[in-house]
Amino acid sequence: MSARRTPLLLRSLFVIGAVIGVVASVEAAPPSSPVPVVDHHQHLLSPQGAALLNTPELAENVPPAVTALLRAHEAGWNDATKLEPLYASDAVVLDVGGPAWLQGRTAAAEHFAKRFVRPYTILPLAWQGDERSGHLAALYSRGEGDARRNVGSVAMRLVREDGAWRVAMVYPVFPGPVLEQPLDAERLVALLDAAGIRRAVVLSVGYWFQSPHFKVDDPVRRTREENRWTAEQVARHPDRLVAFCSLNPISDDALMLLEECAKDGGFKGLKLHFGNADIDLTKPEHLRRVRDVFAAANKARLAIVVHARGGDDYGARHARQLVDELLPDAPDVTVQMAHLWGGAAFAPEALAVYAEAIAAKHPATRNFIFDISDAASAAGTPEAAALLVQRMRLIGIERLYYGSDAAFSGHPDPAASWQALRKGLPLTDEEFARIAGNVAPYLRE
């Protein structure tokens, strides 16, 4: 599960996109289709994790004069005479109650003077512009801290007119993005029950708190607390859930945190997320630190789940380094590749390296397995799905394990995820049945 720089911005854009797009429904799998025994890729969401996702990372590059314009708009929230000078002469505003485009500064001012019954704050999430014009993505928000609520999302175009910044276009969307709510072990077990799945591997998101994509106080303490919370939640359902701890493997405290996880006794393995840590294996220092973590996990007999995509350029060379330089450091434990090829957008070149290494019986791949969470949706096109299945068969169906990823932040729940795989991948019924029945070695020990 990846949490990146501006989750609220992404959710705001999803809301805006829903106004003008169509979300395709997922057809149900045939009633006779098998049900997975285990979900090998799941997450919980702690209260501190939900707070992290719900805290917007504000744009820091907004020009002071634009910020002043936003503050003036807030101050004039119910007064058209104060709002009118803030708009360009030919301003256009989408009337979400229409929908229709309102034209002119007077119409825009009168519309927004009536739109809000209580004061609001404009929280800028992204800005791009020059000295003459710019575009802003923002939230309409009220309250502070846990009491804050996002009442709407907005896209704006701003221009300089008569020597001052003015609003030229406003595209508001209501309601605003929904704040994430914690997902505890009881809720996850209920989702598993609804899907008919017996067990799940719960991967801590402690690595969020050591990620450069978030700014948190005392990241080591917060990572430790997240790992502990995950273990305590999983311990409530020992017959259903298994916990993996997590950390940033290139942090200075990685080996200390790993040792704590190993001594805890509540963890079966370790989750590493190269993307959240901005890891680039082509950098010698990154490679050295990750190798040390692999070796330490092997010594502690902790299985490893790795989200291997560290950046947009992830491909064959990174996959070769993982096979040739990381897997040999963990020869005695299971290493599970997350999301089949390593996460996010389909990376056929990386997957080809993994498949060919296994087909060639590379000695480091003896305990190398793959979960298929998000595989169908990320593949995208039928052509990509066909190529994906070709690579899956080269890897071997016996090395493929069902996973669904977190049931929050827009991800489907375990049942819907399995249905999406059944619909999106051109595997045979026999192959789906084999995947559904596969149970990772670390759960059989």
What are these regions (language model features)?
Residues 198-199, 207-312, 317, 374:
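Active-site gating/metal-coordination segments in enzymes
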Residues 29-36, 54-76, 81-85, 168:
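Short, low-complexity N-terminal intrinsically disordered segments enriched in polar/charged residues
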Residues 151-174:
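Short beta-strand edge/turn micro-motifs at domain boundaries
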Residues 268-269, 282-401:
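Catalytic pocket-lining loop regions of alpha/beta-barrel enzymes
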Residues 48, 92-102, 115:
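A short gly/proline-enriched turn/hairpin at secondary-structure junctions
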Residues 92-93, 106-151:
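Surface-exposed, charged secondary-structure patches
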Residues 36, 52-54, 81-85, 164, ...:
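Mid-to-C-terminal alpha-helical segments outside catalytic/metal-binding sites
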Residues 69, 79-96, 435-438:
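Short, well-ordered alpha-helical segments enriched in acidic and aromatic residues
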